[in-house]
Amino acid sequence: MKGKVAQKRAAASPSGVGEVIRVMPAVVDVEFPHGGVPEVLGALESELEYAGEKLVLEVAQHLGDRMVRCVAMGSTDSLSRGDKFISTGNQMMAPVGRGTLGRVFDVLGRPIDGLGSVSSDVEFRPIHAKAPSLSEQRVAAEVLVTGIKVVDLLAPYLKGGKVGLFGGAGVGKTVLIMELISNVARAHKGFSVFAGVGERTREGNDLYREMVESGVISRDEPSKSQAVLVYGQMNEPPGARMRVALTALTMAEYFRDSEGQDVLFFVDNVFRFTQSGSEVSALLGRIPSAVGYQPTLAAEMGAMQERITSTNTGSITSVQAIYVPADDLTDPAPAASFAHLDSTTVLSRQISELGIYPAVDPLESTSQALSPEVVGSEHYEVAQEVKRILQTYKSLQDIIAILGMDELSQEDKLLVARARKIQRFLSQPFHVAEVFTGHPGSFVSLEDTVRSFKGLVEGQYDDLPEAAFYMVGGIDDAVKKAASLK
């Protein structure tokens, strides 16, 4: 069932009928006749419909000879002892293929966008898969150009890498995500898959509508869309929230392995993936480990994260929103994620209050790719000089606030002027925000980004006014804007 072996749901033949003997919230015990006990991770489907849909269970444990304990993917409120469940003979399956583009799915791959069933050319694959073997993985470190200056210069993303996206509400996280989706489609002809794990229904709805408005998703012609959305919403049982990321990842793997795409895979929020696993673990009766988390935390996180990688055919680059409980970075849940990250993109409220978007903090954001071996010596040196200038400006701000600019040396005054220009030049008009800002969007190539900032730090543009650097693409746009300001 792995790789290019696709299966239709209809092909799954029942291999046994079991009877419900115990119902708990989100967990169900089912008894099967001898010889008909399904495997662990096998999917069971109810004979009856509950609230208009069949209930799906996933086998989590074998209890004795004939009994299995299962995790429910839907509400168990209407379930009764004696209800029948059929073993499908398969794991839970996810729809894959171009027919999924522009659609919104739940954890079971059922469309929830009101646009009817998916096209008949969609295949179904099991959501549990092994990570690519060492021989299948591409080891060459290659930068994924996003077209966003601040990211490409100071915290570049690796193809097949994992990026942690840190940011509170209202600092532009959604717009940044949509621009990344749009730019990857534009520059790499790649698709994006978004997994809403424990997502608020309102936020998920807002994201979908904004994607439709910006053209990332086309409701009239879904095949022209650039993204797939998969939601396991906050009101759903922990089983659905725990598995929705794997459903979305299976869709992303298809685009990588079968179509050779460079895929962007978004997870919002990784903490909720861990949290739902903790809930399920407690319901299954496992003894918790530190701080109440499941004893299998590291294994569950690793099983998902190791599937996100570059192969010889394509890549999956993951951008993962991470909530840090009580700002405690030593908490086991975020700590388990940090071990897998290659880059961090930190969105700052202080920068957004200055009106600089994207509000990426250039000093807090980091990347393993920012080394001479990966990006080249010129890019590395320019990035380090930009950071040095911004850091010095930050340290001088208290002096400026108390004593004023006049008390600075000529050298410091020049450095502050360059820092303010760099700060504004890190802003950029986005394609997906054209409707709101009135500025045409700009995709800046990596070569143009490095050339532009190199000229800035070397003082080639000291004569241009600060305003010329705000909300432009490359340095040529800044020069044109400066001419228009005169």
UniProtKB/Swiss-Prot annotation:
* Primary location: membrane
GO annotations of cellular component type: plasma membrane; proton-transporting ATP synthase complex
Domain of life according to the entry: Bacteria
Residues given in the record as ATP binding sites: G167, G168, A169, G170, V171, G172, K173, T174
Location in the cell reads: Cell inner membrane
Task: List the Gene Ontology MF annotations in alphabetical order.
Answer: ATP binding; ATP hydrolysis activity; proton-transporting ATP synthase activity, rotational mechanism
Is Membrane found in the keyword set? Answer: yes
Q: Which InterPro entries match?
A: AAA+_ATPase, ATP-synt_VA_C, ATP_synth_F1_bsu, ATPase_a/bsu_AS, ATPase_alpha/beta_chains, ATPase_F1/V1/A1_a/bsu_N, ATPase_F1/V1/A1_a/bsu_N_sf, ATPase_F1/V1/A1_a/bsu_nucl-bd
What are the UniProt keywords, alphabetically? ATP synthesis, ATP-binding, Cell inner membrane, Cell membrane, CF(1), Hydrogen ion transport, Ion transport, Membrane, Nucleotide-binding, Translocase, Transport
How does this protein sit in the membrane? Answer: Peripheral membrane protein
Does the record's keyword annotation contain Nucleotide-binding? yes
EC number(s) given by UniProt: 7.1.2.2
Catalytic activity annotation: ATP + H2O + 4 H(+)(in) = ADP + phosphate + 5 H(+)(out)
The record describes the protein's role as: Produces ATP from ADP in the presence of a proton gradient across the membrane. The catalytic sites are hosted primarily by the beta subunits.
Annotated family = Belongs to the ATPase alpha/beta chains family.
Quaternary structure and partners: F-type ATPases have 2 components, CF(1) - the catalytic core - and CF(0) - the membrane proton channel. CF(1) has five subunits: alpha(3), beta(3), gamma(1), delta(1), epsilon(1). CF(0) has three main subunits: a(1), b(2) and c(9-12). The alpha and beta chains form an alternating ring which encloses part of the gamma chain. CF(1) is attached to CF(0) by a central stalk formed by the gamma and epsilon chains, while a peripheral stalk is formed by the delta and b chains.
| NCBIfam families to which the protein is assigned, alphabetical | atpD (TIGR01039)
- What is the designated name of this protein? ATP synthase subunit beta
Q: What is the lineage of its organism?
A: Bacteria, Pseudomonadati, Pseudomonadota, Alphaproteobacteria, Rickettsiales
Gene that encodes the chain? atpD
